Amino acid sequence: MSATVSTVSADLHKAIDAGDEDKITKITASYGSEQRDKIIPAYHANYGIPPSEAIRKAFKTGFYETMIVHAWTSRFELRAKLIHESIKGKIDVITLLDLVIACMPDDWYGTKVCYTKLYGRELVREIDEVIGVGTPWQSLVSGWVKHDRKYRKSIKSDAEAFRMALDSDNYEVLGSMLATSVPDEWMRIAAAYEETTGMPIDQAIASRYVKVDQTALILAHHWLCDPGQAAAYICSQCCAERKGNYARICRFTSMMYDHCLKCKYAYRAYGSLAMDIRKCFEPKLAKHLLVFWRVE
């Protein structure tokens, strides 16, 4: 961190007091989640209030305020609380998929610890009990949350096994392969699949599955290939809706922009990230999203 924690805390405090959204966004976007987690307690110690609470008091409730509040909440606490919200009552599947699949391994471990502290339940067991079984997305999530990956060293046979599972709608095999593959080996499996079939894996999945099952499997594939690729996929879905999916893009941006800086390049598969953000979201929010995703 180029500036000291106390300096950043002071700069953020001044920006919040002044109601300067542009400055707040610039400061927030300059630091990753691990760095922000060091700034949060310093801010609290200096000003007697967490930055998230200071932001809530300074701004009207809305998507921008929620996005910035999320960004200035401990990453483990935030993910744990959002997962809990997504699985209580009717399951918010898309939100759960984003929170579970698009998560760095170290962040997942920290989230599990925090979840137990907050709710007295073991996170993986809680998810397994709540989501049930019987669909592709359920099978994938059940395996994914265990974070038990290993090298199989059988690229061609794995690519063929995935093809056969797709052709026969064997979603248990599909979910298991995605949930247990090591990222660099998965990229080779995906390349072998495309070489053999002439079709990229994401297109093959899209030809077989729809709605949340399609989203789950394609998101997992992209995440294993590169977090930026997964971010581009999520952003493309947010921008595909006529008015834009405000809640989803704000939530995902606040949590993952620093891990997915290749998003703007991967998004070229769907068009221009900057143009789509401007088209789908109101200007007041769009300008902040552009800063986080490093596009103009």
UniProtKB/Swiss-Prot annotation:
Its main location: cytoplasm. Keywords: Annexin, Cytoplasm, Cytoskeleton, Microtubule, Repeat. One of its GO terms (biological process) is cytoskeleton organization. InterPro entries: Alpha_giardin (IPR008088), Annexin_repeat (IPR018502), Annexin_sf (IPR037104). Annexin repeats lie at residues 3-72, 74-146, 153-223, 226-294. PROSITE patterns: ANNEXIN_2 (PS51897). Pfam families: ANXE1_4th (PF22293). GO terms for molecular function: calcium ion binding; calcium-dependent phospholipid binding; phosphatidylserine binding. Giardins are involved in parasite attachment to the intestinal mucosa and in the cytoskeletal disassembly and reassembly that marks the transition from infectious trophozoite to transmissible cyst. They may interact with other cytoskeletal proteins such as microtubules in the microribbons or crossbridges, to maintain the integrity of the ventral disk. Belongs to the annexin family. Giardin subunit alpha subfamily. This is Giardin subunit alpha-4. It comes from Giardia intestinalis (Giardia lamblia).
